[in-house]
Amino acid sequence: MADYALFVGWNRSVAGREQQAIDLFARVMEYYGQLQNDGKIESFEPVVLSNHGGDLNGFVLLRGDAAKLDEVRREEAFTNFSIEANFCLENFGVIDGYIGDGITRVFSQWSIHFS
């Protein structure tokens, strides 16, 4: 069961780079599918948010083992996709996250500081 996640989020495409952003999304979805088939990630879920006036309009949550996701984050393909995303998407970012049993571990660590 996955205990770790990568949150890959963005706002909207840069004006004039909409087609590049659409093409990038398709290639990245294919790449994430290959990562899942290769056992490097447990799963991934793309999410597009409804209009809300904020600066987050979509994200993909990659789920898996912390060590494997750390390796994925350092792969050349992941790095290249992230660089391209920074040129065609506003507010693009990748953030580490905890899910499943990972949440319990993090809260246990935090609770030490509140005792």
Where in the sequence are the language-model features?
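Conserved short beta-strand edge segments in small beta-sheet-based binding/regulatory domains
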Residues: 80-98
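Short S/T/G/P-rich N-terminal loop/turn motif that feeds into the first structured element of a domain
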Residues: 1-56, 64-74, 94-115
